[in-house]
């Protein structure tokens, strides 16, 4: 489970990669990371996943199986560039409406530009807000998705509680996230790739290795599959399951509001 600690001044601390920082400071630090990589976010995911994130996202959309009917509403959190939302809308035959929520305006700007180019603006709403305090009424959405974003939220338990609140009864939560590799040889290979190659590739692509170093460290600090599934259950979700992708490099977690 993610740990929060009390700092010397009495405030709560949380992990920012391998560092411990005041809870209120983590969000600002994460915002700086994604402001730096916003325009190269897809390339960043290619580097982080060795190109496999596209197949994982396709599997996520297949698992969601969005309904092909008007009125089907999905909230995609930490989805600023629109990658998941675009896939959902297309999979629904352009019937679904996706609300893309992100705390980072730079990421949302990239997503809005892409939506216009894809002629999907009518199916999308872009909202700048915090996953821990969603600006929506209870029971507003049929599905809640978040891909490679939950580990960057300072209070994951609060984000999961908010997900439960805004879902309709019968609504589904899907969380795609880097996870704990469960194959002995693969874990060593991926560790070597993560801590040696990824920051250097990031520096070559963006001129700055630091954001990539944080992202690698944040994966190691994130709860493993069983512990994160327990957090989802604790938030109130039922029928909680997870599916490992590529030996556990990533995992898709699913839960229902019943």
From Swiss-Prot:
SUPFAM superfamilies, sorted: S-adenosyl-L-methionine-dependent methyltransferases
GO molecular function terms listed in the Swiss-Prot or TrEMBL record: 2-methoxy-6-polyprenyl-1,4-benzoquinol methyltransferase activity; demethylmenaquinone methyltransferase activity
Pathway it works in? Quinol/quinone metabolism; menaquinone biosynthesis; menaquinol from 1,4-dihydroxy-2-naphthoate: step 2/2; Cofactor biosynthesis; ubiquinone biosynthesis
Task: Tell me the InterPro entries matching this sequence.
Answer: SAM-dependent_MTases_sf, UbiE/COQ5_MeTrFase, UbiE/COQ5_MeTrFase_CS
Instruction: Tell me the Gene Ontology biological-process terms attached to this UniProt entry.
Output: aerobic respiration; menaquinone biosynthetic process; methylation
User: PROSITE patterns, per this entry?
Assistant: SAM_MT_UBIE, UBIE_1, UBIE_2
The answer to keyword Methyltransferase applying to this record is yes
Give me the reactions it catalyses: a 2-demethylmenaquinol + S-adenosyl-L-methionine = a menaquinol + S-adenosyl-L-homocysteine + H(+); a 2-methoxy-6-(all-trans-polyprenyl)benzene-1,4-diol + S-adenosyl-L-methionine = a 5-methoxy-2-methyl-3-(all-trans-polyprenyl)benzene-1,4-diol + S-adenosyl-L-homocysteine + H(+)
Question: Where is the region Disordered?
Answer: 1-21
- What positions does the entry give for S-adenosyl-L-methionine binding? 81, 102, 130-131
Q: Which UniProt keywords apply?
A: Menaquinone biosynthesis, Methyltransferase, S-adenosyl-L-methionine, Transferase, Ubiquinone biosynthesis
Q: What is its EC number?
A: 2.1.1.163, 2.1.1.201
State the superkingdom: Bacteria
Q: What does this protein do?
A: Methyltransferase required for the conversion of demethylmenaquinol (DMKH2) to menaquinol (MKH2) and the conversion of 2-polyprenyl-6-methoxy-1,4-benzoquinol (DDMQH2) to 2-polyprenyl-3-methyl-6-methoxy-1,4-benzoquinol (DMQH2).
Record-stated family: Belongs to the class I-like SAM-binding methyltransferase superfamily. MenG/UbiE family.
HAMAP family tied to this protein: MenG_UbiE_methyltr
Name this polypeptide is given: Ubiquinone/menaquinone biosynthesis C-methyltransferase UbiE
- Give the gene symbol: ubiE
């Amino acid at each position: 489970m993610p740990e929060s600690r009390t700092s010397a001044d009495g405030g709560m601390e949380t992990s920012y990669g391998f560092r411990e920082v005041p809870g209120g400071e983590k969000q600002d630090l994460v915002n700086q990371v994604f402001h730096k990589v916003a325009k190269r976010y897809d390339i960043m995911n290619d580097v982080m996943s060795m190109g496999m994130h596209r197949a994982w996202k396709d599997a996520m959309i297949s698992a969601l199986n969005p309904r092909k009917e008007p009125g089907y509403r999905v909230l995609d959190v930490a989805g600023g560039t629109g990658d998941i939302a675009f896939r959902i809308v297309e999979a629904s035959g352009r019937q679904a409406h996706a609300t893309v929520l992100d705390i980072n305006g730079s990421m949302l700007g990239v997503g809005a530009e892409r939506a216009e180019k894809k002629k999907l603006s009518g199916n999308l709403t872009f909202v700048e807000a915090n996953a821990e305090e969603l600006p929506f009424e209870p029971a507003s959405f049929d599905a809640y998705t978040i891909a490679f974003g939950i580990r960057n939220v300072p209070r994951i338990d609060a984000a999961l509680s908010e997900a439960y609140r805004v879902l309709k009864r019968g609504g589904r939560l899907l969380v795609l996230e880097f996870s704990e590799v469960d194959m002995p040889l693969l874990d060593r290979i991926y560790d070597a790739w993560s801590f040696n190659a990824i920051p250097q590739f990031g520096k070559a692509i963006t001129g700055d290795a630091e954001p990539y170093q944080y992202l690698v460290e944040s994966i190691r600090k994130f709860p493993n599959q069983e512990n994160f599934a327990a957090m989802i259950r604790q938030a109130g979700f039922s029928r909680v399951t997870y599916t490992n992708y590529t030996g556990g490099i990533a995992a898709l977690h699913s839960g229902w509001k019943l």
